[in-house]
Amino acid sequence: MKFVLLFGVLVVTLFSYSSAEMLDDFDQADEDELLSLIEKEEARAKECTPRFYDCSHDRHSCCRSELFKDVCTCFYPEGGDNEVCTCQQPKHLKYMEKAAGKAKKFGGKIKKWFG
């Protein structure tokens, strides 16, 4: 009975050690992947397309506004056959940015009043 108990403890210890090693390997791989994604995002951020400019060459290249990324919106102008794509900010995001700006100002006033 003691042998079975000792063997069980040994198996559980080895299993937990091996799973901890595997988790460390996964964490390191995730960390490396995250760093490479950040580097790619920084490189891509330097080449963004400003608002109301043509984004048909790369529809994911629109710049970020204060809080949200602009969206490449495509449409056909009236009486035209060619599709036109420009970076634009959706209205609901525009209103959310305005509300966030007003909330920041109001928060600053409250902080000023109650110091």
Curated annotation (Swiss-Prot):
Instruction: Supply the InterPro entries for this chain.
Output: Spider_toxin_CSTX_knottin, Spider_toxin_CSTX_Knottin_CS
Proregion residues are 21-44
Instruction: Reply yes or no: does the keyword Coiled coil apply.
Output: no
Q: In which tissues is it expressed?
A: Expressed by the venom gland.
Of the GO CC terms on this record, one is: extracellular region
**Leader peptide range in chain numbering:** 1-20
* Keywords from the UniProt entry: Disulfide bond, Knottin, Secreted, Signal, Toxin
Q: Which cysteines are joined by disulfide bonds?
A: 48-63, 55-72, 62-87, 74-85
A Pfam family annotated for this chain is Toxin_35
Annotated compartments: Secreted
GO MF term list: toxin activity
The family assignment reads: Belongs to the neurotoxin 19 (CSTX) family. 01 subfamily.
Entry domain remark: The presence of a 'disulfide through disulfide knot' structurally defines this protein as a knottin.
Name of the protein in question: U3-lycotoxin-Ls1k
Which organism's genome codes for this protein? Lycosa singoriensis (Wolf spider)
